[in-house]
């Protein structure tokens, strides 16, 4: 039987645990690079889900004393100058076939600067052309809508930040080990997250099936989760979907709300600003949901996962409900995700190699 998105989501716990277990070996080039020069500024080149993964991880880099500049590859290649102050460059493409990311990487290399490629396929065009290919240790997903690979990309970025901070003594060994232990607990908790989310989706399936517009908000690291909902809901559920930074939503986008919209509010712990916005928007839309790591559910429209972790690691948990909703809402709407559409798109537009 061919794997589905659900197959890969259910594998995430084991896959993430394996990445954590092997990260010192798989990311050895990062540690070696960090031992040779001080790393204060990193340029990340990414688009699509890879860009969203970078948004999820960026503030942990900042916590580790590393400024992050995230660029869309095409815009970077065509219109921007490469920052000479960047100490390290990472190009991200799960397939390793993104034409724009490859072009952006070559622009950096033409200036005599090495590039790390974070990919599920080190033998891909991006992996082969890079100076340091980094395997995210998931293999290639045969389903076009990656889930396991997204979570693995976020985790690998967090581990890269951790290795640099460790190598350059910005974290003590005990601090670093506590972060690793948290990541291990997250991986072990994912099966329970899946069980709770499945029950939540079943409870609200009528609302989710009938949704004609989905909007998500998040803050900090959870902006990446909201943006990934935008990307993947658009691909799978195939109705207009958007993800916003919490405060940005309050500066105009709220004006489009109507009685057919479904809204999701992501939080790692009870957040007064997010909950005030949800309370205000509830009368104006079809339904509002809170997805939180808090212990107690606010109401039956709240999925409370009851997991206490550092804010910077919360995307690894809260992305799982998004991934499960992608699969189940598509199914509820009668969309067969195994049937490819626009099959000649990459060939005609040359967006993938």
Annotate the PLM regions.
Residues 6, 17, 55-58, 62, ...:
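Predominant activation on well-ordered alpha-helical scaffold segments within soluble catalytic domains
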Residues 33-185, 219, 254, 262-307:
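Glycine-rich phosphate-binding loops that contact phosphosugars or nucleotide phosphates
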Residues 166, 239, 269, 287, ...:
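Short, well-ordered loop/turn and helix-capping segments at boundaries between secondary-structure elements
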Residues 304-353:
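Peripheral docking tails and interdomain loops at the edges
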């Amino acid at each position: 039987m061919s794997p589905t998105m659900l197959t890969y989501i259910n594998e995430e716990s084991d896959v993430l645990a394996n990445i954590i277990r092997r990260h010192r070996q798989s990311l050895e080039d990062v540690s070696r690079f960090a031992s040779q020069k001080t790393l204060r500024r990193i340029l990340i080149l990414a688009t699509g889900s890879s860009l969203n993964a970078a948004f999820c991880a960026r503030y942990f880099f900042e916590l580790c004393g590393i400024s992050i500049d995230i660029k869309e590859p095409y815009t970077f290649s065509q219109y921007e100058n490469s920052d000479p102050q960047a100490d390290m460059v990472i190009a991200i493409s799960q397939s390793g076939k993104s034409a724009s990311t490859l072009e952006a990487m070559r622009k950096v290399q033409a200036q005599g600067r090495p590039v790390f490629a974070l990919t599920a396929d080190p033998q891909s065009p991006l992996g082969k052309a890079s100076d340091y290919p980094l395997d995210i240790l998931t293999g290639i997903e045969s389903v076009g809508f990656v889930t396991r690979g997204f979570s693995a990309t976020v985790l690998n970025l967090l581990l890269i930040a951790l290795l640099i901070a460790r190598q350059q003594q910005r974290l003590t060994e005990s601090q670093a080990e506590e972060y690793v232990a948290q990541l291990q607990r997250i991986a072990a908790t994912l099966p329970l997250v899946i069980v709770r989310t499945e029950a939540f989706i079943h409870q609200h399936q009528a609302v989710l099936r009938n949704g004609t517009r989905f909007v998500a908000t998040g803050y900090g690291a959870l902006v990446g989760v909201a943006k990934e909902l935008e990307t993947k809901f658009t691909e799978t559920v195939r109705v207009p979907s958007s993800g916003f930074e919490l405060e940005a939503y309050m500066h105009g986008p709220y004006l489009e709300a109507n009685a057919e919209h479904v809204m999701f509010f992501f939080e790692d712990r009870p957040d007064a600003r997010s909950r005030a916005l949800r309370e205000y928007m509830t009368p104006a839309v079809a339904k509002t949901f809170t997805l939180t790591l808090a212990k107690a559910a606010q109401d039956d429209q709240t999925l409370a996962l009851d997991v206490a972790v550092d804010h910077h690691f919360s995307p690894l948990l809260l992305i799982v409900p998004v991934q499960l909703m992608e699969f189940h809402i598509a199914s509820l709407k009668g969309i067969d995700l195994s049937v490819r559409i626009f099959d000649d798109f990459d060939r005609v537009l040359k967006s993938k190699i």
